[in-house]
Amino acid sequence: MSDVTTAEFNEEGKYLRKVRSFVLREGRLTKGQAAAMEQHWPAMGLDYSPEPLDLKEVFGRDADTVLEIGFGMGASLVEMAKASPELNFIGIEVHKPGVGACLSVAGEAGVTNLRVFHHDAIEVLENSIVKGSLARVQLFFPDPWHKKRHHKRRIVQSEFAQLIRNTLKIGGVFHLATDWENYSEHMLEVMGAAEGYKNQSLTGDVVERPDHRPLTKFEARGHRLGHGVWDIMFERID
């Protein structure tokens, strides 16, 4: 689980920039992570720029692109990239050891269709991603901010939903997953009210975990203990 930002939102879901949590909790890299950063960042790292990325130039090809917000240590993101070599993958993570771990695993796996940002997701989405360019955006297990007084810090808010919508192609999908039922209800409420989206669930709520999202060790342990995980997928229709 990883924080992307501690930004708060007002009652209308308006994004308000705040001091970001990763400045306070930046951890030290292990020797392996530091070595992976040095070895693999030149090929897989994306330096933040307020200018939109040319995805064809970045990946050297035209292909559908999947972006994941807050990939943690990156194991599942690398697994997805390896399983779908026909797709391009971009990951965003503010926790530097996570970026180093992801690059280490990606290097060992030999994936060539993955690029990563070590930066704030909101700024990347606002400035670095061409509008209407993504086939899928993934937000898996964001901080649930489970105390009610902290709900306004949850990243899934109305303005955020529209920010994601702007990056998606028509027909592109915003895929969310959480292991907090209350947050899944919040996600469904926000996304259900968001303009330009359609829930892919035939029952209007959650979907079964799709094959493209790997089962994490944490999630598998939760299943054994009877804990739930909720997958939510909304398609951009307008």
Swiss-Prot record:
Substrates-to-products reaction catalysed: guanosine(46) in tRNA + S-adenosyl-L-methionine = N(7)-methylguanosine(46) in tRNA + S-adenosyl-L-homocysteine
Keyword match S-adenosyl-L-methionine: yes
Family under the similarity heading: Belongs to the class I-like SAM-binding methyltransferase superfamily. TrmB family.
Enzyme class, broadest EC rank: transferase
Molecular functions (GO terms): tRNA (guanine(46)-N7)-methyltransferase activity
PANTHER family: 3-DEOXY-D-MANNO-OCTULOSONIC-ACID TRANSFERASE/TRNA GUANINE-N 7 - -METHYLTRANSFERASE, PENTACOTRIPEPTIDE-REPEAT REGION OF PRORP DOMAIN-CONTAINING PROTEIN
Cellular component terms per the entry's GO annotation: tRNA methyltransferase complex
Function according to Swiss-Prot or TrEMBL: Catalyzes the formation of N(7)-methylguanine at position 46 (m7G46) in tRNA.
Pfam families cross-referenced by the UniProt entry: Methyltransf_4
Species in which this protein is naturally found: Shewanella sediminis (strain HAW-EB3)
Domain of life: Bacteria
Pathway entry: tRNA modification; N(7)-methylguanine-tRNA biosynthesis
Binding site for substrate: K147, D179, T216, K217, F218, E219
Binding of S-adenosyl-L-methionine, residues: E68, E93, D120, D143
E.C. number(s) listed in UniProt: 2.1.1.33
Name of encoding gene: trmB
Keywords of this entry: Methyltransferase, S-adenosyl-L-methionine, Transferase, tRNA processing
Protein name: tRNA (guanine-N(7)-)-methyltransferase
InterPro entries per UniProt: SAM-dependent_MTases_sf, tRNA_(Gua-N-7)_MeTrfase_Trmb, tRNA_methyltr_TrmB_bact
Active site: D143
